[in-house]
């Protein structure tokens, strides 16, 4: 017996247009209709802060999942109760905090690919906050630290930790090679 139902969400974006997301949810969490309309207002400033940070921190990094993980790391700090992040309650607070995301620069260009990744992650984050399971998060919530060398990014739960995220979750950005 299939215990999943497919849910369709159409999201209106402040940057214009809509995005439709299909995902499977456990039946006990599914609504009676398989066609659900939910509108998420994603602030253009939040998209821009993330995209400009990605430009400075991860623009040469492949795969896309690692770029998305930088956004999730930032959002993890926004949501964190950890003392180190007590004054960081917005995306702007996190990326402009002294000695944190050094790649953020207000003059960094807005590159379409990075804007798309930032917008996608913000939509997934909002869906998660609304109780949607399995939104395609690529980094666990406890990972609030990262560093990169221009080729790869490494994420950890403590800035002194020698243990890094192992990329064991599914990659929602993986292209279907079969069609």
Regions found by a protein language model. Name each.
Residues 1-47:
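N-terminal export signals and maturation junctions of secreted/periplasmic proteins
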Residues 30-31, 35-179:
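Bacterial extracytoplasmic/cell-wall-associated proteins, especially those involved in peptidoglycan
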């Amino acid at each position: 017996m299939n215990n999943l139902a497919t849910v369709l969400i159409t999201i209106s974006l402040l940057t214009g247009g809509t995005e439709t997301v299909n995902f499977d949810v456990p039946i006990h969490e599914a609504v009676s209709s398989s066609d659900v309309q939910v509108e998420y207002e994603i602030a253009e400033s939040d998209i821009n802060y993330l995209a400009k940070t990605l430009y400075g921190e991860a623009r040469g990094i492949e795969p896309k999942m690692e770029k998305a993980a930088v956004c999730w790391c930032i959002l993890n700090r926004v949501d964190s109760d950890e003392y180190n992040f007590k004054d960081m309650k917005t995306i702007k607070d996190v990326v402009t905090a002294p000695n944190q995301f050094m790649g953020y620069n207000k003059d960094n260009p807005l590159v379409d690919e990075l804007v798309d990744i930032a917008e996608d992650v913000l939509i997934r984050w909002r869906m998660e906050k609304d109780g949607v399971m399995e939104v395609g998060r690529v980094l666990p919530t406890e990972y609030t630290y990262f560093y990169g060398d221009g080729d790869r990014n490494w994420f950890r739960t403590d800035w002194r930790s020698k243990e890094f995220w192992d990329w064991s979750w599914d990659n929602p950005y993986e292209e279907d090679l079969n069609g």
